[in-house]
Amino acid sequence: MKFFIGDNLRLAGKTRHGKNRIRENGDLWEVTNLDGQDSSILSTKACVVPIKESRRDEWRWLDLPSDEHMEIVEHIQ
């Protein structure tokens, strides 16, 4: 699955940590930065921020394609 800056993701928590982030910030997040996408050696990471305007300072990095704490439920382009 290919991601682009500006895409929206619906996330769900896998671990207690991930579930707490979803409870605090909501399940809709926006991709603001991508790192390592052009490398065959490095893993790809996506920086995401919550869609909620009041929580825009609560960014986090997601390891793609599988993150330890969160899973991507829906990719909204």
Feature map (PLM): residue ranges:
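Intrinsically disordered, low-complexity, charged/polar segments
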Residues: 45-77
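Short beta-strand segments and strand-loop junctions that repeat across beta-rich extracellular domains
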Residues: 16, 23, 50-52
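Short coil-to-beta transition motif at edge beta-strands of beta-rich domains
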Residues: 2-18
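Short beta-strand-centered aromatic/proline hotspots
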Residues: 20-36
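Short, solvent-exposed secondary-structure boundary/capping segments
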Residues: 38-46
